[in-house]
UniProtKB/Swiss-Prot annotation:
Family classification: Belongs to the OMP decarboxylase family. Type 1 subfamily.
Catalytic activity: orotidine 5'-phosphate + H(+) = UMP + CO2
Domain of life assignment: Bacteria
Name the UniProt record assigns to this protein: Orotidine 5'-phosphate decarboxylase
One GO BP: 'de novo' pyrimidine nucleobase biosynthetic process
GO CC annotations on file: cytosol
Pathways involved: Pyrimidine metabolism; UMP biosynthesis via de novo pathway; UMP from orotate: step 2/2
EC id: 4.1.1.23
Catalytic-site annotation from UniProt: 73 (proton donor)
UniProt keyword Zinc-finger, yes or no: no
Length: 245
């Protein structure tokens, strides 16, 4: 089985930056995308954009050379989640995610759904604890563990289920790399260059701090999308990361 998207036209990037596209309008989103280079980043499409614009928007990004992280955080019964993950693979996305709290059977079903795609399968990662959540939020759900300990528990479960990695906060990256090894991918939202506002993220780091902590892919939104010169902002971030490497 192969994905329907044409992969040969996509740019190959070594950048760990994934730009979060948070637009409610296709034309505005593509106007931004056309100002940046697919060699400088990948793009993240989340629930709002995918609900509004559908799979064709992902194809539009592919046609412009970008690899896409489809951030839909699937969380359902195992069979439904597996079918959704397979549909994402058919679309040709680079990465797709599920909620680790969906449990072992759900995550295993999702992983097995990607086996027919072979080397063309997207990376499959799991969300541990949302970066907006604090200890008090978990306590409201009856979870007495700290965000870090709960995330570690879910990350260990994710690895046992054979997924490629997890979404986690940068603060947890050092611990996860030590406990789960370098091959286990860490994807971190809430990354903001020095001087950026925190917004609705609570556990944030700069790109340089995240890289030093062991983050493999860092999601950056408004500091790039709201920049007067997003291409220059991306280049500056990548240069700063290459100096730290």
């Amino acid at each position: 089985m192969t994905s329907t998207a044409i992969t040969s036209s996509r740019a190959v990037t070594s950048s760990p930056v994934v730009v979060a596209l948070d637009y409610d309008n296709r034309d505005k989103a593509l106007a931004f995308v056309d100002r940046i280079d697919p060699r400088d980043c990948r793009l993240k499409v989340g629930k709002e954009m995918f609900t509004l614009l559908g799979p064709q928007f992902v194809r539009d990004l592919h046609q412009r050379g970008f690899e896409v992280f489809l951030d839909l955080k699937f969380h359902d019964i195992p069979n439904t989640t597996a079918r959704a993950v397979a549909a994402a693979a058919e679309l040709g996305v680079w990465m797709v995610n599920v909620h680790a709290s969906g449990g072992a059977r759900m995550m295993t079903a999702a992983r097995e759904a990607l086996l027919p795609f072979g080397k063309e399968a997207p990376l499959l990662i799991a969300v541990t604890v949302l970066t907006s959540m604090e200890a008090s939020d978990l306590q409201d759900l009856g979870i007495t563990l700290s965000p870090a300990d709960y995330a570690a528990k879910l990350a260990a479960l994710t690895q046992r289920c054979g997924l490629d990695g997890v979404v986690c906060s940068a603060q947890e990256a050092v611990r996860f790399k030590q406990e789960m090894g370098q091959a286990f991918k860490l994807v971190t939202p809430g990354i903001r260059p020095q001087g950026s506002e925190a917004g609705d993220q609570r556990r944030i780091m700069t790109p340089e701090q995240a890289q030093a902590a062991g983050v493999d892919y860092m999601v950056i939104g408004r500091p790039v999308t709201q920049s007067a010169d997003p291409a220059a902002t991306l280049r500056a971030i990548n240069v700063s990361l290459s100096k730290e490497a």
